[in-house]
Amino acid sequence: HTPGHTEGSVCLLARETGLLFSGDTLFAGGWGRVDLPGGSAEAMVESLERLARFEDGIAALPGHGRSTTIGASRPWLDAVVAARSLEI
C-alpha cells in the first residue's frame, strides 16, 4: 500500500525478478500527482521513503512513461527522504 497519489495506491514488488510495478507512485524523474481527490503529499513522502529502502538494481515500471530503476531515482528519492517533503 503506497498512498499519496490516491488513498488506494499500491506498488507491487516481484523480488525474484527485481521488478517493481510502481503505478502512479514512482516515475522516471519524479512522483505521481498528489492534488487529486484522496491525494496527500504527506502520504506520498511516506510511500517514497518505503520505496527508497529498496536496492538500486530494482527496476521500476510505472503506470505511465518509461521505466527507471531505484538507483536512477536515488538522487531525488534521497532528497525527499532527507527533507521529509516533496518541496525539494
Sequence positions of predicted segments:
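Metallo-beta-lactamase
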Residues: 1, 6-88
